[in-house]
């Protein structure tokens, strides 16, 4: 054991060896390099003490240089990395949700590259409002009197409740008390706003008289939460929006609609059910509608508030609005995305989220056949050999939208000859970029819905690397 400890080289020797093996490391931050080298050898020391070293293992610099190099490169690599999405989940929360349109990406780069008119009044040259940058567009697209953008939809709901319902009660159907992901629940957001939740009805059935009976002198608003991430089926009923809006008006109360993922377009032509759009809920009587910018809208992360001008103006004056506001990059990307919606057909072609959701099954089948042929050719021989097959399956919209509805697709499934599909999946997490797919019946499957033709060369490369790595680790 002592001999193993003594064989561990000095940090300076390691720095020199790493620089000789990879000259680009000479430019790496010296302090971080030293810490990474120390971290690597500390782990080796722990393995020695615990008796976990392999028999006859050598801890010389030459023997450990490949492992040390891998550890150092991993430590120097940016934590924020691009990835290939082959899951078929279009709005993949874990992978950054919506992919921005080319126009939106260019707008973000322009805003990031230099100064801009974020809060500059272009008429007077004085202080302006960042809210004005997208408000007119949102009003045109939704039919709202006014609009406000904050940094996500949970923030939008929090701001609305803090402004209009703090210290009072909000009446909500028990069947709409959703969990919105990451263990965050609508009742908890309400509690943080200072509003008191007043549940009405049963989980599966709520009637107009349930809302009416709950209204009292402490009631500040009626609220509907669109259950976009789950469905209640069977013996079920909910109050139609126009009826609830009429009840709210009779009692001089605002009706707040939390649409969650939110949409400006009708997806029924893509084979999906008729979901409420932002313009439709405002037209049917909602005073305020909140929704996300980075889900089926296809833009950057944002919480969008639309509705009555007097209410939106009050929201703008709430000090909490400053804490929740968006920066110039978000607003630039959102404006560019919204401008594409001025031509609905152009939006479906140019906004990746809409394009992927609406890709026809026949087009996906052709894409799968083309990809399968490329994989059979590109992975033939050596440790990368795989059995490649096609399988009819389904994709998901994701992001909590359309949870019950399937999008027909064709999967390209790989069954490796020299490792398991599970080992391949694990190895693909370590490639650059990582490739995320699906495990289906001992196969690793790729859904072309969320891949493009431009991804193919990179996809082939990382698959070859991962198959070789997985096979080597088994040996």
From Swiss-Prot:
Pfam families: SelA. Keywords: Cytoplasm, Protein biosynthesis, Pyridoxal phosphate, Selenium, Transferase. Its main location: cytoplasm. It is an enzyme of class 2 (transferase). GO terms for molecular function: L-seryl-tRNA(Sec) selenium transferase activity. It comes from the Bacteria. This is L-seryl-tRNA(Sec) selenium transferase. It comes from Desulfovibrio desulfuricans (strain ATCC 27774 / DSM 6949 / MB).
């Amino acid at each position: 054991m002592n001999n193993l400890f003594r064989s561990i080289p000095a940090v300076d020797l390691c720095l020199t060896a790493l620089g000789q093996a990879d000259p680009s490391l000479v430019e790496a931050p010296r302090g971080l390099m030293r810490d990474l080298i120390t971290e690597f050898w500390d782990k080796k020391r722990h393995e020695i003490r615990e008796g976990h070293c392999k028999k006859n293992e050598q801890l010389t610099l030459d023997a450990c240089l490949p492992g040390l190099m891998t550890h150092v490169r991993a430590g120097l690599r940016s934590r924020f990395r691009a990835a290939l999405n082959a899951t078929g989940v279009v709005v993949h929360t874990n992978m950054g949700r919506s992919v921005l349109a080319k126009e939106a990406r260019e707008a973000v780069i322009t805003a990031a590259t230099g100064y801009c008119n974020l809060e500059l009044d272009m008429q007077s040259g004085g202080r302006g409002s960042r809210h004005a940058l997208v408000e007119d567009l949102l009003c045109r697209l939704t039919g709202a009197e006014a609009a406000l953008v904050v940094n996500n939809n949970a923030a939008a709901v929090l701001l609305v409740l803090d402004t209009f319902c703090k210290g009072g009660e909000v009446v909500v159907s028990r069947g709409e008390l959703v969990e919105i992901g990451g263990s965050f629940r609508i009742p908890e957001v309400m509690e943080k706003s200072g509003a008191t939740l007043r549940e009405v009805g049963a989980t599966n059935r709520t009637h107009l008289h349930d809302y009416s009976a709950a209204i009292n002198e402490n009631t500040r608003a009626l609220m509907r939460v669109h259950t976009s991430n789950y469905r209640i089926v069977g013996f079920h009923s909910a109050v139609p929006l126009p009826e609830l809006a009429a009840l709210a008006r009779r009692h001089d109360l605002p009706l707040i609609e939390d649409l969650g993922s939110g949409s400006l377009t009708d997806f029924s032509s893509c084979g999906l059910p008729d979901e409420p759009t932002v313009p439709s809920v405002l037209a049917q009587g909602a005073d305020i509608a909140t929704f996300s910018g980075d889900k089926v809208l296809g833009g950057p992360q944002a919480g969008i508030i639309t509705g009555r001008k007097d209410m939106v103006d009050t929201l703008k004056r709430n000090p909490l609005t400053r804490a929740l506001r968006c920066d110039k990059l978000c607003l630039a990307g959102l404006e560019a995305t919204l401008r594409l919606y001025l031509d609905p057909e152009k939006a479906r072609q140019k906004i990746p989220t809409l394009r992927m959701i609406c890709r026809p099954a026949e087009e996906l089948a052709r894409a799968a056949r083309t990809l399968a042929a490329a994989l059979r050719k590109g992975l033939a021989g050596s440790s990368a050999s795989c059995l490649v097959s096609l399988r009819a399956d389904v994709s998901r919209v994701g992001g909590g939208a359309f949870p019950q509805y399937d999008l027909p697709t064709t999967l390209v499934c790989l069954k490796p000859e020299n490792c398991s599909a599970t080992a391949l999946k694990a190895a693909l997490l370590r490639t650059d970029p990582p490739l995320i797919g699906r495990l289906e019946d001992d196969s690793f499957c790729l859904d072309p819905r969320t891949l493009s033709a431009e991804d193919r060369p990179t996809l082939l490369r990382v698959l070859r690397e991962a198959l070789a790595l997985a096979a080597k680790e088994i040996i």
